[in-house]
Amino acid sequence: MKKYSLLIALLLPLLIFGQQESYYSLYRYNMNVINPAYAGAEAANMLSLTSRRQWASMDDAPSTVAMSFSSARENNVGLGISVVSDNVFIEQQTFAYVDFSYKLDMGESQLYLGLKGGGNFYKADPSSLSSYTGGDPTQVALSSFNPNIGAGAYYSASSFWVSFSIPRLFNSKRDGDLVVTAKDRVHSYVGGGAYIGIGNGLTVKPSLMLRKVKGLPITTDLTGMVSWQNSFDVGVSVVNFPLTIA
């Protein structure tokens, strides 16, 4: 059965922080991008394609394209793949990972444990700058590949789910040949949601995802969805809302 989803994202930039890792307001449809344990958690094969663009009227504005696929295999094994491409002005990052999960059957619920492996292709090309001269040694193109691994756990029951993951376990430098260079820092995700039946084939699906990066407040994604016959979803998401815990 085909499943259609509509999500209206309300972006509330109460505080502005540098965001190194793509954040997904549709994380329920890109779950194995941030949590490898989700690979194979659904009975059917899952393919997701999403695109996001900020400041659409500006040339070379930030944009993200994400693709994920996961499949339940034999012997409680799940496999998946995810590719995310981020473009921000002269910078391009492509994250490519393979996911593996194993299901522990706990009667009326399931616990999935997962690992992911892959890496980040990074490129910065100053030749697209209007001020580019071609002879300036400070305007050389940069490129690098940083391998990494990630891990996660996903618990699923008939009325709720809980997720914890660190999709990239190690900090990595954008360009290892430079003394001073930007770093991609470790991101931790904790989330959960519920399924609340209200009759007439309708189910309410509230969920919350928290993200933590060292040196920054916890950021949140609060989503409310209504599903009809488990085939059509509509909802609202409030994203990038900073949360500080003393």
Where is each model-derived feature located?
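Bacterial Sec-dependent N-terminal signal peptides
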Residues: 1-23, 224
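Subset of outer-membrane beta-barrel
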Residues: 19-246
